[in-house]
Amino acid sequence: MIARCLLAVRSLRRVGGSRILLRMTLGREVMSPLQAMSSYTVTGRNVLRWDLSPEQIKTRTEELIVQTKQVYDAVGMLGIEEVTYENCLQALADIEVKYIVERTMLDFPQHVSSDKEVRAASTEADKRLSRFDIEMSMRGDIFERIVRLQETCDLGKIKPEARRYLEKSIKMGKRNGLHLPEQVQNEIKSMKKRMSELCIDFNKNLNEDDTFLVFSKAELGALPDDFIDSLEKIDDDKYKITLKYPHYFPVMKKCCIPETRRRMEMAFNTRCKEENTIILQQLLPLRAKVAKLLGYSTHADFVLEMNTAKSTSRVTAFLDDLSQKLKPLGEAEREFILNLKKKECEDRGFEYDGKINAWDLYYYMTQTEELKYSIDQEFLKEYFPIEVVTEGLLNTYQELLGLSFEQVTDAHVWNKNVTLYTVKDKATGEVLGQFYLDLYPRDRKYNHAACFGLQPGCLLPDGSRMMAVAALVVNFSQPVAGRPSLLRHDEVRTYFHEFGHVMHQICAQTDFARFSGTNVETDFVEVPSQMLENWVWDVDSLRRLSKHYKDGSPISDDLLEKLVASRLINTGLLTLRQIVLSKVDQSLHTNTSLDAASEYAKYCSEILGVAATPGTNMPATFGHLAGGYDGQYYGYLWSEVFSMDMFYSCFKKEGIMNPEVGMKYRNLILKPGGSLDGMDMLHNFLKREPNQKAFLMSRGLHAS
């Protein structure tokens, strides 16, 4: 997400909500107010600073606003007949680059800084700048001049990407309501500011949540010793268990004590329940009202207009069709799990209640994997020490995409455990960008897995290219004494997925910042990263990624084959859960009178066949609702149709490490960024329209 669990925060997408709104700026003749901001007007290097104090963040935020507004005001005073491509469209793009890079240094620290005051200042900067974004995006005088440019400019003489920039600018202006009466514009502006603040607060609440539970060793039954040894002790015989992923999932998957799992699941799905429920009750009606004012039936209709799906009817049909196809598989998997539970309750002397509870699901899905394929993830992870996985991952991407990575020594980073790499084209030596790896959990750090686009790869005013910069932020388990961080196979998959977003950010080479990196349709953005997950299900690829942390021995061929064969395990229930989340998201953004917790519970029962725990409110913990995926969570499944089609029709057929296919993928899918529509890129790559055949096969189904 971007993230597997949250919206990946991409180059022009904000954790606080929707895409960064159109910043209608003008420039070359009036750029002087911004010259003092940074040296990045004349260089393509990484200019990002991570040592700003709270006071500096506040001061630079105000300076950025004042200086940028001076440019906007100058544009607004231009005579309507004076507008040209150079003094409007191109200059707008030049200023946009400056603003994006400076803003990154101000609002990214809220997600990664260990300093509470810095995080607070960064969050306030994000709110302040988001309000400013909205103000500037709704400048009617700027919009009028852009419309005038379209009417008078000889479009045949400008590059296709520039025409796209012009068309998107006008489209976004209309989606902001700039063609409507001033009174309506002001109403929309006010609501957008409030929505932005609510989104920022929603995810801040989740990031800052420090809930933990305390258990005795007996209550952590069947959890491995290395996990228990890594826990903070409370008194002499109690252990502190947080709700962060490195604690939550091991407990839910391996702890044999039902009451422990019940308490964990209850706590996890009541995080920020009170405050975030209130936020949703305000946010959802505001979105609906803005959509109505703009002429759309629902907020879902509003956001889907810009996606490859285009309409709520297509999304609903896709989800309902997939749900029906998976229904028999889900029923069979639930029956198997229920039999496992019944037998275990008999063996351990537990009361058998005859149903699968929410806190049973991960536990018995793990047992299913172990029984059917003899795979013990705790044993398997000993072959995935993070250093070996990282080296194998980097080598795979370098070989596949024709790149070389070099670690930067003495790099300027936000934490001592963060590393920085430079990316070069292997054939030419050209520097394409840099990426940070922030792999381990810290207090108050962003608690999911995501790629953050930090600096856009685009053209600068002097014609040189600014390098793209991205950060991969995840939360793998910390190394402990005598033992490195060991990754479960699903964490290796997450690593590959998120690094796929990093490569999209780095390899895209566009003229305009707005189209750089992962700034594509929301239901297409996961395609490149999902496609690259296939490498962790290939025997030869897995050999490159693994080595026992003690003696360097390889995984046995037998175990590798079992691991690859296990890919379809629990796929029915896992996919049905994704459908549940997608349906909840669609429902809440088409009917604001619905209660979020009740809607989630309804779909859990109807589609997943596993009841939500009474008293929980999972949507209040669902960061995607306020993280840029509003009405668009379906995109994870939708985009897999495309990613699987690409993989099976090209890589699986020609060889997954075939450098020619890898370069084709880099040039036709990654390099264009958002300068082309996603469907056009797919057609260029596949040489045909995409279909669902490979996707259905990946779910254990057959195309009708």
UniProtKB/Swiss-Prot annotation:
<keyword id="KW-0479">Metal-binding</keyword>
<dbReference type="InterPro" id="IPR001567">
    <property type="entry name" value="Pept_M3A_M3B_dom"/>
</dbReference>
<dbReference type="GO" id="GO:0005829">
    <property type="term" value="C:cytosol"/>
</dbReference>
<dbReference type="InterPro" id="IPR024080">
    <property type="entry name" value="Neurolysin/TOP_N"/>
</dbReference>
<keyword id="KW-0963">Cytoplasm</keyword>
<dbReference type="Pfam" id="PF01432">
    <property type="entry name" value="Peptidase_M3"/>
</dbReference>
<keyword id="KW-0378">Hydrolase</keyword>
<dbReference type="InterPro" id="IPR045090">
    <property type="entry name" value="Pept_M3A_M3B"/>
</dbReference>
<dbReference type="InterPro" id="IPR024079">
    <property type="entry name" value="MetalloPept_cat_dom_sf"/>
</dbReference>
<comment type="function">
    <text>Hydrolyzes oligopeptides such as neurotensin, bradykinin and dynorphin A. Acts as a regulator of cannabinoid signaling pathway by mediating degradation of hemopressin, an antagonist peptide of the cannabinoid receptor CNR1.</text>
</comment>
<keyword id="KW-0809">Transit peptide</keyword>
<keyword id="KW-0007">Acetylation</keyword>
<dbReference type="GO" id="GO:0005758">
    <property type="term" value="C:mitochondrial intermembrane space"/>
</dbReference>
<feature type="modified residue" description="N6-acetyllysine">
    <location>
        <position position="664"/>
    </location>
</feature>
<feature type="binding site">
    <location>
        <position position="501"/>
    </location>
    <ligand>
        <name>Zn(2+)</name>
    </ligand>
</feature>
<feature type="binding site">
    <location>
        <position position="497"/>
    </location>
    <ligand>
        <name>Zn(2+)</name>
    </ligand>
</feature>
<dbReference type="GO" id="GO:0004222">
    <property type="term" value="F:metalloendopeptidase activity"/>
</dbReference>
<keyword id="KW-0645">Protease</keyword>
<feature type="active site">
    <location>
        <position position="498"/>
    </location>
</feature>
<keyword id="KW-0496">Mitochondrion</keyword>
<dbReference type="GO" id="GO:0006508">
    <property type="term" value="P:proteolysis"/>
</dbReference>
<feature type="transit peptide" description="Mitochondrion">
    <location>
        <begin position="1"/>
        <end position="37"/>
    </location>
</feature>
<keyword id="KW-0482">Metalloprotease</keyword>
<dbReference type="GO" id="GO:0046872">
    <property type="term" value="F:metal ion binding"/>
</dbReference>
<keyword id="KW-0862">Zinc</keyword>
<protein>
    <recommendedName>
        <fullName>Neurolysin, mitochondrial</fullName>
        <ecNumber>3.4.24.16</ecNumber>
    </recommendedName>
</protein>
<feature type="binding site">
    <location>
        <position position="504"/>
    </location>
    <ligand>
        <name>Zn(2+)</name>
    </ligand>
</feature>
<comment type="similarity">
    <text>Belongs to the peptidase M3 family.</text>
</comment>
<dbReference type="InterPro" id="IPR024077">
    <property type="entry name" value="Neurolysin/TOP_dom2"/>
</dbReference>
<dbReference type="GO" id="GO:0006518">
    <property type="term" value="P:peptide metabolic process"/>
</dbReference>
